[in-house]
UniProtKB/Swiss-Prot annotation:
SUPFAM superfamilies registered for this protein in UniProt: L28p-like
Superkingdom of origin organism: Bacteria
GO molecular function: structural constituent of ribosome
Keywords, comma-separated and alphabetical: Ribonucleoprotein, Ribosomal protein
UniProt protein name: Large ribosomal subunit protein bL28
Family, as annotated: Belongs to the bacterial ribosomal protein bL28 family.
Protein encoded by which gene: rpmB
Cellular component, GO annotation: ribonucleoprotein complex; ribosome
Organism from which the protein derives: Listeria monocytogenes serovar 1/2a (strain ATCC BAA-679 / EGD-e)
Entry annotated with the keyword Ribosomal protein: yes
Keyword Ribonucleoprotein: yes
Region (Disordered): 1-27
GO BP annotations, alphabetical order: translation
Biased composition (Basic residues): 10-20
Length: 62
């Protein structure tokens, strides 16, 4: 299973790195994902959750 937030759906994004001369090369931006235990269908489960979802209170740890 890929690293993706189960709450917000955030995952790695790709784009270009640009030098001073505006040459481009591919790079990725990785989401700040934490593996936490939360209740899924009434049972505790370890899943990937973004730090943004944890800070905003969208999910509560068990």
């Amino acid at each position: 299973m890929a690293k993706e937030c189960v709450i917000t759906g955030r995952k790695s994004r790709s784009g270009n790195k640009r030098s001073h001369a505006m040459n481009s090369s591919k790079r990725t931006w990785k989401a700040n994902l934490q593996k936490v235990r939360i209740l899924v269908n009434g049972k505790p489960k370890k899943v990937w959750v973004s730090a943004r979802a944890l800070k905003s209170g969208k999910v509560e740890r068990v």
